[in-house]
């Protein structure tokens, strides 16, 4: 199962995108769990994640998170700004699949 964790300041805007990503995964026949959290909650959920997606507004925290949680082996990815703004779940899912493939 693909467990995608989205993180933003409060989890609100990413909550909408999480639903779109889950729908895209369902359309592709991929079993997934897609959840959104505030970055303050990341330590509590990092060990359940296949990948952590950061909202574009948290791009400045990428290095901090990679250093803090690097030992988990969970990859991080910044969500494309255009896909985030348009709530394009399919594009984000495709980027996730590409990232975890490599």
Where are these regions (language model features)?
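P-loop/Walker A phosphate-binding loop and immediately adjacent motor/lid segment at beta-alpha junctions
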Residues: 2-11, 63-83
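Conserved active-site segments centered on acidic
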Residues: 2-39
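Short, well-ordered alpha-helices that flank and scaffold nucleotide-derived cofactor binding pockets
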Residues: 19, 23, 67, 94, ...
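Ser/Thr/Gly-rich flexible loops in soluble cytosolic domains mediating phosphotransfer, phosphorylation
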Residues: 3, 75-102
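Short glycine-/acidic-enriched loop or helix-start segments at secondary-structure transitions
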Residues: 16, 62-65, 88
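N-terminal glycine-rich "phosphate-gripper" loop used for MgATP/nucleotide binding
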Residues: 54-63
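Short acidic/histidine-rich motifs immediately flanking catalytic phosphotransfer sites
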Residues: 46-51
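Short acidic active-site motifs
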Residues: 38-42, 61
């Amino acid at each position: 199962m693909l467990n995608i964790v989205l993180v933003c300041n409060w989890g609100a805007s990413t909550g909408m995108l999480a639903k779109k990503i889950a729908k895209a995964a369902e359309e592709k026949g991929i079993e997934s769990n897609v959840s959104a959290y505030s970055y303050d909650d990341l330590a509590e959920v990092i060990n359940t994640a296949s990948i952590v997606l950061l909202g574009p507004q948290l791009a400045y925290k990428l290095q901090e998170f990679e250093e803090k949680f690097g030992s988990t082996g969970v990859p991080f990815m910044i969500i494309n700004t255009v896909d985030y703004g348009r709530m394009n779940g399919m594009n984000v899912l495709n980027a996730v699949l590409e990232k975890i493939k490599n």
